Amino acid sequence: MDKILSGKTVAIDIKGQIKSYTEELKASGKSLKISSILVGDDGGSVYYQNFQEKLANNLGIDFEKIKLDESISEENLKLKIEELNKDDSVNGIMLLLPLPKHIDERVVTNLIDADKDLDCLSEVSVGRFYKGEKCFMPCTPNSVITLLKAYNIEIEGKEVVIIGRSNIVGKPLFQMFLNENATVTVCHSKTKNLKEVCKRADILVVAIGRANFIDSSYVREGAVVIDVGTSEVNGKITGDVNFDDVYEKASLITPVPGGVGSLTTTLLLKNVCKELD
C-alpha cells in the first residue's frame, strides 16, 4: 500500500485549474497580476521570488518582481505598498520576509490592502481569518487542509495534535481544523508528556523546524502524519519527522520534500483566482 501523501500530485491538479481560469480570462480580454516585493538580497528570498515568478508565468498570471535595496527607508517602502494598493491592475501583493532590521515589519505589513494581501500578513487580514470572514487563506496551513481533503481523509470528529504554535502555521492551522470540526490540541516547548499527547492523535501535524525530531515513539499505529518542517542536514532538505522510522507505523505520511511544501506556492497563486475558491 502506498502511504505517501504527495503534495506534488495535488499541486498538478490545482495548477490545471489555475491555467484554465487564466486562459478564460485572457480570452475575454482580462488578466491577473501579482506584485512581489523583495527588500535586500537574502538568498532564500531571492530563490523563492524567482520560483514564484516562473510558476506564475507558466500559469498565465502576470508577475511583477520588485527588488528594493536593503537600505531603503521604512517610509519609502510604505509609499511603494500604498502605490500598489491604489493600482487597480494589481490583484495581489506579496511582501517577502524577513525585512531588514531597521524596518518595522508589523507597521509595513499592516499597510497591505487586505483585499490584495495574498499571504494574509496584515492584522486586518488575520482578523478576518479568525472571525471566519472572506479573506485570503494562510498558505501553509491551507496546504495541510487541502492535502488531507484531496486524499479524502476525514477530519470531522478526529483528534488532531499540532506540534508548533507559530503565527504562520500552528495558530492558523488550529483554527482551520476547528472549522472542520476536529478536536484539536496544540503542543509547544512547555508541553508536558509530549509523547503521550502525540499518541492520541488520529492526525499528527509537526511544524517546529527541528530535523528528524519526531520518531515512531510519538506516533500511534495508523495515524496520519503531516510534516511541515524543513531543515537542511548535510546539504539535504529534511523534515521534522524521521520519515523512515515513522513510515511503517503511520497509515499515511507526507515526505519532505514533496509534501506540504510542494503545495504552498501553488495555493498562494490560487488565492488571486478568487472565483476558484
UniProtKB/Swiss-Prot annotation:
Residue positions binding NADP(+): 164-166, 189, 230
Any single GO BP term: purine nucleotide biosynthetic process
SUPFAM superfamilies xrefs: Aminoacid dehydrogenase-like, N-terminal domain, NAD(P)-binding Rossmann-fold domains
GO MF annotation: an example: methenyltetrahydrofolate cyclohydrolase activity
Keywords: Amino-acid biosynthesis, Histidine biosynthesis, Hydrolase, Methionine biosynthesis, Multifunctional enzyme, NADP, One-carbon metabolism, Oxidoreductase, Purine biosynthesis
Listed Pfam families: THF_DHG_CYH, THF_DHG_CYH_C
Leader sequence segment: none
Pathway: One-carbon metabolism; tetrahydrofolate interconversion
Reactions performed catalytically: (6R)-5,10-methylene-5,6,7,8-tetrahydrofolate + NADP(+) = (6R)-5,10-methenyltetrahydrofolate + NADPH; (6R)-5,10-methenyltetrahydrofolate + H2O = (6R)-10-formyltetrahydrofolate + H(+)
EC number(s) per entry: 1.5.1.5, 3.5.4.9
Gene Ontology CC terms, in alphabetical order: cytosol
Similarity comment: family membership: Belongs to the tetrahydrofolate dehydrogenase/cyclohydrolase family.
Function text: Catalyzes the oxidation of 5,10-methylenetetrahydrofolate to 5,10-methenyltetrahydrofolate and then the hydrolysis of 5,10-methenyltetrahydrofolate to 10-formyltetrahydrofolate.
NCBIfam families found in the cross-reference section: PRK14172.1 (NF010769)
Subunit text: Homodimer.
Protein name per the record: Bifunctional protein FolD
Source organism per UniProt: Clostridium perfringens (strain SM101 / Type A)
